[in-house]
């Protein structure tokens, strides 16, 4: 399947618009499309901080939350080690969330269950990453080399 013209958010935006239910055949097509997306990721870990607040659901075509959730999942699936299949919530009390689900539909819905309306404490976000590294005895090379924050909200003063 050629997915060169599709982006991760195209797929997740479809899920958001149909989160009340989707036929099994449609879910299979979305999952196959998701799995066929090109890999633009280097070998470095990239951790995404995902804002899922209500304001991210605005807009008439592609919703900002679709961009945040899709890139959170996209990079998480390509990470290695302790950060594989994880993203961080955009929150006053951020969480490192392990993504669960059998297909992209379930994964997107699972990630959306962590949505909250909050600003973020960036210092706590970095503490969370550091504590995860210490707990898992990670080497420097296993740490995320990039942190991407996708939000339309505000940051607390660090």
Language model segments and positions:
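Acidic, glycine-rich A-domain
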Residues: 1-158
């Amino acid at each position: 399947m050629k997915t060169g013209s599709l982006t991760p958010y195209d797929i997740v935006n479809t899920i958001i618009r149909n989160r009340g239910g989707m036929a099994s055949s449609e879910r299979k097509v979305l999952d196959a499309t998701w799995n066929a997306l090109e890999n633009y990721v280097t070998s470095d870990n990239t951790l995404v901080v995902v804002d899922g607040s209500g304001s991210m659901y605005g807009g008439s075509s592609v919703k900002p939350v679709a961009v945040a959730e899709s890139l959170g999942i996209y990079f998480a699936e390509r990470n290695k080690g302790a950060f594989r299949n994880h993203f961080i919530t955009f929150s006053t009390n951020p969480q490192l969330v392990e993504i669960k689900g059998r297909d992209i539909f379930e994964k997107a819905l699972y990630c959306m269950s962590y949505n909250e309306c909050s600003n973020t404490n960036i210092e706590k976000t970095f503490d969370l990453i550091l504590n995860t590294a210490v707990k898992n005895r990670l080497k420097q090379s296993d740490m995320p080399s990039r942190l991407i924050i996708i939000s339309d909200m505000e940051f607390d003063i660090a």
